[in-house]
Amino acid sequence: MINTVIFDMDGVIFDTERLAHRCWLEVARQNGIEDMDKIYPSIIGCNHSRAAETLLNYYGENFPVENFLQDTRRTFNRYIDTCGVPIKPGVTELLMFLKTNGYMTALASSSDRAIVEKELKSADIYKYFDKIVCGDEITHSKPDPEIFLKAVSALKSQKRESMVIEDSYNGLQAALSAGVTAVMVPDMLPATKELIGTGVKVFPNLLSVKIALKENKIK
C-alpha cells in the first residue's frame, strides 16, 4: 500500500517546463545556435551537469555550455520575477490531502536547492514536504535512480510503499529503476504506448491522482 509520495518539481508542481523551453530557444536564437528544439526533450528532467554533458555531446567540446546555461537561467529568472511561479492545477489540493491523511512526502528535483526552496516558499507549499532532495546534492542525474532512492531513504520509507509523480521520460526511467511506483502526469511530453508498457501509471492531472489514492487504486 502506498504511504509515500515523491514529487518532481518542474512540470509537475510548477508549470515551468514550457517556460524553460521558451527561454532555451530564445537564448539559442539570440546566439545563432541551431537544433535546440530537437535536443531539448532529452534534457527535460536532468540536472545542471547532465544538461551540460548532453549539450557538449551534441554540439562539441567548444560549445560555450556554461555561458549558455547561465543565460537561460537569467532569462528564466527574469520571467519568474516579473510574473511569479506558475503553479499547476491541483497541487495544493493533493498536498493537503496527503498531509491530512498521513502520507510521507518528498520533493526530488533536478534543480539546485536554492532554486527549489525559493520557488516552493514563493508558492507557499514548502511546508508540505517532509524531505527535499535536489540536483546539486546527487552524483548521478535522472535517468539514474539515485535521487529517488535518496528520497526514499531520507523518509525511512520502503520502495514498495513509495510512488513518484513525474512528467519527463528521464524522471520516469529513474523511478522505474528505483523500484518504486511510477506515475506520469504528462506535461510537454506525451505518454507513449511503450512507456505504459513498462508499468508507468498515467493520469491526466493531479486531482485525478488524488482521487486514485483516496480510492486505493494506486498500488
Residue positions per predicted region:
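A short, Lys/Arg-enriched amphipathic alpha-helix followed by its capping loop at the start of a domain
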Residues: E26-N31, E93-Y103
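An amphipathic alpha-helix signature
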Residues: H21, L25, H48-E53, R73, ...
